[in-house]
């Protein structure tokens, strides 16, 4: 399954909005080289050059060569993306992931309901004449 150039562009700009283009370019470069990449002109410590290549040349995707260079970086990009941004890429939009997200939402709702119930018991015990201010409230 191929990830569209526009989707990679979107997540990289979103990550750069949070961390900065230089940070993202450096992280991609380090991961690309760690994974054995060496074909692209990315050099550790050359933050400005790496940022220029990734964000201001290749990510534009105006030519086939630019898009191909970004495709070569995809394994490194996937490795550095935080979970909040990975979902924007089609390869992560699976039935299993949707089920896990639904379960996560259900768990969050259950936790909120639990906390609301504890708060209601506490309020009733302390503010409705159900006890003096020295009484403790125990919830099991």
UniProtKB/Swiss-Prot annotation:
> Gene3D superfamilies, from UniProt?
Putative bacterial toxin ydaT (1.10.3600.10)
Please summarize what the entry says happens upon disruption of the gene.
The toxic effects of racR silencing can be observed in the ydaT deletion mutant (where YdaS levels are elevated), but the ydaS-ydaT double deletion mutant shows complete attenuation of the toxic effects of racR silencing.
- Keyword flag Lipid metabolism: no
Please name the GO terms of the biological process aspect recorded for this protein, alphabetically: FtsZ-dependent cytokinesis
Say yes or no: keyword Transcription present: yes
Q: What induces it?
A: Not expressed under normal physiological conditions. Expression is repressed by the transcriptional repressor RacR.
Query: What Pfam families does its record include?
Result: YdaT_toxin
Alphabetically list the UniProt keywords: Transcription, Transcription regulation
UniProt superkingdom: Bacteria
Please give the function described in this protein's UniProt entry. Answer: Transcriptional regulator that causes a severe detrimental growth effect and reduces cell viability. When expressed, it alters expression of a variety of bacterial regulons normally controlled by the transcriptional regulatory protein RcsA, resulting in deficient lipopolysaccharide biosynthesis and cell division. YdaT has no effect on Rac prophage excision. Overexpression of ydaST reduces growth and leads to loss of cell viability. May contribute to toxicity and morphological defects.
Q: What else is known?
A: Encoded in the Rac prophage region. The ydaST locus was predicted to encode a toxin/antitoxin (TA) pair in a genome-wide prediction of TA pairs, however it was shown in subsequent studies that it does not form a toxin/antitoxin pair. Whether or not the YdaST-RacR module forms a toxin-repressor combination or an atypical toxin-antitoxin system, or whether they are actually essential regulatory components of the prophage genome, has been debated.
Question: Would you tell me the protein name for this molecule?
Answer: Transcriptional regulator YdaT
Q: Which organism is it from?
A: Escherichia coli (strain K12)
């Amino acid at each position: 399954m191929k990830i569209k150039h526009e989707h990679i562009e979107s997540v990289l700009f979103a990550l750069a909005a949070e961390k900065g283009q230089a940070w993202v370019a450096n992280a991609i470069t380090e991961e690309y080289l760690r994974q054995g990449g060496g074909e692209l002109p990315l050099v550790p410590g050359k933050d400005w050059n790496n940022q220029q290549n990734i964000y201001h040349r290749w990510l534009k995707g105006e030519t086939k060569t630019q898009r191909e260079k970004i495709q070569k970086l995809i394994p490194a990009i996937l490795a550095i993306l935080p979970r909040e941004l990975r979902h924007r890429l089609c390869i992560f939009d699976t039935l299993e992931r949707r089920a896990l997200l639904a379960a996560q939402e259900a768990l969050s709702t259950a936790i909120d309901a639990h906390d609301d119930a504890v708060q209601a018991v506490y309020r009733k015990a302390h503010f409705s004449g159900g006890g003096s201010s020295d009484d403790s409230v125990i919830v099991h």
